[in-house]
A protein has these predicted regions:
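Bacterial N-terminal signal peptides that target proteins for export
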Residues: 2-13
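C-terminal segment of classical bacterial N-terminal signal peptides
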Residues: 16-26
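Short S/T/G/P-rich N-terminal loop/turn motif that feeds into the first structured element of a domain
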Residues: 25-250
């Protein structure tokens, strides 16, 4: 597509003709998509390589992501490996953020996507969860689409029934104190509710550790929580689609 547009522009320069209508329309559409605010939903899923299949799984997953590129999937796909965890070390969290309900309802070529998944990924992996979350801007600092930093802190919070509103109100009251990118999402479908996840992208593990005092939630929500897990993630630069990782910093 890029080379075709270059030829069109070159032809206009040479002959002095007006820009073709299709070029103007495509340019306007691209600009509109770039300026459009992110949608409110994220799809977050998790899988792990079967025992003894790590090499085959990684190669197959990378081939599957290449299928998404060839299919011109417009979604931005993130992949993180779980680094610090008591239960999920080396598992992969893959996700897309800033989506609308209409976009999630119309993924690229779903039949072909599933076929390629069955060939390249499923023989070597176990899928362990797939959920849709809603971004909560009143609790967060950021726009719901995480900066693709090389590290991230990932917190999962499960609440007792009927306490979601009180939990959100308590976090919203502390929102102005947030110092760095902090993204909260509420599970909509895909598991036991109420469940929330917090994602804090950071440039390094040192940054996460240096900000550990900010990790704690307000004391007033302690009685609402049935389980809370804090893990750290590594962004996988070779497992991204339409995402450019932030450069490493010394």
């Amino acid at each position: 597509m890029k080379h075709r547009w270059i030829r069109i522009v070159g032809a206009v320069v040479l002959v002095g003709a007006p820009l073709p209508t299709i070029f103007i329309a495509q340019t306007a559409q691209t600009a509109a998509q770039t300026d459009q605010a992110p949608g409110p939903y994220a799809r977050i899923a998790i899988m792990r390589a079967l025992d003894g299949h790590s090499v085959e799984w990684e190669a197959g997953y990378i081939r599957h992501l290449e299928w998404h590129r060839q299919a011109r999937d417009t979604f931005a796909w993130y992949s993180y490996s779980v680094w610090a965890s008591t239960e999920r070390q080396r598992w992969i969290i893959y996700a897309t953020f800033g989506r609308t309900a209409a976009e999630l309802s119309n993924p690229v070529s779903p039949v072909e996507d599933e076929r390629d998944n069955l060939i390249n990924v499923l023989p070597h992996a176990q899928f362990l969860g797939n959920a849709v979350y809603e971004f909560l801007p009143a609790l967060s600092r950021g726009n719901g689409v995480p900066t693709p930093a090389l590290r991230a802190e990932y917190t999962t919070v499960e609440l007792t029934q009927g306490t979601g509103k009180a939990f959100e109100a308590a976090l919203a009251a502390e929102q102005s104190k947030l110092q760095g990118e902090t993204l909260w999402y509420r599970m909509v479908v895909g598991g036991d509710t109420p469940r929330y996840v917090r994602l804090r992208p950071r440039v390094s593990l040192a940054a996460i550790l240096d900000e550990r005092a900010d990790q704690a939630l307000p004391d007033k929500v302690n009685g609402l929580i049935s389980k809370m897990t804090v893990e750290t993630l590594n962004l996988r630069p070779n497992m991204l689609v339409n995402v450019t990782p932030e450069p490493a910093r010394q």
